[in-house]
């Protein structure tokens, strides 16, 4: 594990991390930082996939549950071209060509730049989620 990924995981193990307000938390400047967010998951037959080139995502579910779709990024049909300023592109993946990862409170997924991923999907019924996404520069 790289030192930056170690910092990301170490941050998620801190006491009180579940009490953080929404927003950005600096961990190691622009090399490692966290985005705290709360939202309701959605039911959909066509998940909205995304990918990043500059950062690895460590997506930690602090409370609630969700399904994150995963597929190799080359399977994505882009609906919004890559925006380098925001480090994100959006697209879809043909049904049957992606995998669903079920995450519940206390679990995480590490998503690399080659990974297309579709967060915020309901795991059955729609539910409220608190997620901390730690961004780790490649």
Task: Show where each model-derived region lies.
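Compositionally biased, non-globular sequence tracts
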Residues: 1-8, 14, 80, 86-92, ...
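A short, N-terminal "cap"/entry segment at the start of jelly-roll beta-barrel domains
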Residues: 1-36, 43-51
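Conserved short histidine dyad/triad with adjacent acidic residue
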Residues: 34-52, 62-77, 113
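Short acidic (Asp/Glu) patches
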Residues: 36-52, 84-97, 118
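Short, conserved beta-strand element in jelly-roll/cupin
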Residues: 53-66, 72-74, 80-93, 135
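His/acidic/aromatic-lined binding-pocket segments of jelly-roll/cupin-type domains
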Residues: 56-60, 101, 108
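Conserved metal-binding segment of the jelly-roll/cupin
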Residues: 102-121
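A short hydrophobic beta-strand segment most commonly corresponding to one strand
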Residues: 108-110, 126-138
């Amino acid at each position: 594990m790289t030192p930056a990924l170690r910092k990301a995981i170490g941050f998620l193990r801190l006491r009180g991390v579940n009490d953080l307000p929404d927003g950005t938390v600096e961990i190691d400047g622009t090399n490692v930082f966290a985005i705290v967010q709360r939202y309701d998951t959605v039911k959909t037959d066509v998940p909205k996939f995304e990918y990043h080139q500059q950062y690895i995502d460590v997506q930690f579910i602090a409370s609630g549950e969700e399904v994150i779709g995963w597929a190799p990024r080359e399977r994505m049909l882009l609906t919004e071209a890559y925006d380098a300023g925001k480090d994100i592109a959006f697209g879809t993946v043909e049904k049957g060509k992606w995998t669903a990862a079920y995450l519940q409170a206390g679990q995480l997924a590490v998503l690399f730049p080659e990974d297309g991923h579709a967060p915020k999907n309901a795991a059955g019924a729609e539910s409220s989620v608190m997620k901390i996404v730690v961004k780790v520069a490649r």
